[in-house]
Amino acid sequence: MRIVFDIGGSVLVPEDPDVEFIKAIAYELIKISEDHEVAVVVGGGKVARKYIKAAKTFTPNETFKDYIGIHITRANAMLLIAALGEKAYPFVIQDFRKAWEVIQLKKIPIMGGTHPGHTTDAVSALLAEYLQADLLVVVTNVDGVYDSDPRKNPNARKLDRITPEQLVEIAMEAESKAGGSGVVDALAAKFIQRGRIRTYIVGKKDAYHLFDVVRGKHSGTVVEP
């Protein structure tokens, strides 16, 4: 299979780099790459949001602030490259065609953000579409898709299996609320829908066992076209 992994920045670097987690997922990714083609997109997480918030003091320019976030995602990506060692391409990939070339070299391409205006969730969905990936695995700080925000509603129900259309609906509803955000943003959900991409959305606990996740053994949500 060809698999794209979307690793959330808040999972990789919650406050400081989670070194043990980075070691664990690097081990899992190397093991998976022995039998599958693998590409990874890394997010910016809380660190990126802190920098963007600070930048608001100095500039109203949203595109400029997006670029700050992109640089943070690439710093996080470099951490994972270091952990993967020789198995990873040694530089952060910045376009999809290069990611394709790196896969042909039997290396793992690692990406961060690419352009202002969309998140690394969207980058991973577009990359999966471009590569015609068999599977997209989204690792986030929530252990799946819920019918409402589990961080605010203790009665929220996790959805084991949904369609891309349902994912779009849930993501758009989450973003319509003040300060709201879903486990996958609406633009990424629309790309998943457009590309008809089979997607697993899992939490950090499952991510320690990515080898099992790609075989369908996880407690997250399956998005099935």
From Swiss-Prot:
Record keywords, A-Z: ATP-binding, Cytoplasm, Kinase, Nucleotide-binding, Pyrimidine biosynthesis, Transferase
InterPro entries: AceGlu_kinase-like_sf, Asp/Glu/Uridylate_kinase, Uridylate_kinase, Uridylate_kinase_arch/spir
Keyword Ribosomal protein: no
Gene3D superfamilies in UniProt: Acetylglutamate kinase-like
Catalytic reactions of this protein: UMP + ATP = UDP + ADP
GO biological process terms, semicolon-separated: 'de novo' CTP biosynthetic process; UDP biosynthetic process
Pfam families: AA_kinase (PF00696)
Gene Ontology molecular-function annotations: ATP binding; UMP kinase activity
Function: Catalyzes the reversible phosphorylation of UMP to UDP.
Matching PANTHER family: URIDYLATE KINASE, URIDYLATE KINASE PUMPKIN, CHLOROPLASTIC
Official protein name in the record: Uridylate kinase
Species of the source: Thermococcus gammatolerans (strain DSM 15229 / JCM 11827 / EJ3)
Encoding gene (name): pyrH
